[in-house]
Amino acid sequence: MSNKNVNVRKSQEITFCLLAGILIFMAMMVAGRAEAGVALGATRVIYPAGQKQVQLAVTNNDENSTYLIQSWVENADGVKDGRFIVTPPLFAMKGKKENTLRILDATNNQLPQDRESLFWMNVKAIPSMDKSKLTENTLQLAIISRIKLYYRPAKLALPPDQAAEKLRFRRSANSLTLINPTPYYLT
């Protein structure tokens, strides 16, 4: 191998290391900014049958921003159907504050009682606008956090902690299929 080839290879390695370092630095900067804003207190909500309500915490981690929070529940197809009511459905949240959403069952026992039912809990955070910037061109994004809401009937045949043991796997050609014979959604 000639000196020229070695120098080119070292130059490529140095360039690669510099680019990787810049990419890592930029990722760390973005991750630091991701801490600010609105966060939900759970990654999913389980609504046990018979309860009057369940709660979901919403936190504004941004010290300097106020958000308008809008929340609602959709069915598994993504359509609002009024089977669950969220209160308050709309409120303003100042910086470094927490509020609790209450989810109320309005199904009148019309959901299947032999298995869980899937819904989507949606929380939209709309940032406030600084009045001094109203004359400027600005881009503001409203973020919707969407988590699963499971309605769990009271008398399911299998306890939830035994559901994972009942899962089965089937292998065929180049795929692996998971078979869930339980009444639970397992995620």
Spans of model-derived segments:
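Terminal connector regions
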Residues: 108-154
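Buried hydrophobic-core signal for structured, non-transmembrane domains
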Residues: 54-60, 103, 119-124, 176-180
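Short, acidic/polar linear motifs in exposed loop/turn regions
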Residues: 62-65, 127, 181-184
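N-terminal signal peptide c-region/cleavage motif recognized by signal peptidases
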Residues: 29-31
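N-terminal secretory signal peptides that target proteins for export/translocation
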Residues: 1-13
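Beta-sheet-dominated interaction scaffolds and their linkers
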Residues: 35-58, 158-171
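Short beta-strand and strand-turn-strand segments in soluble, beta-rich domains
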Residues: 68-70, 74-89, 187
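Intrinsically disordered, low-complexity Pro/Gly/Ser/Thr-rich segments with frequent PxxP/GP/PP motifs
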Residues: 81-109
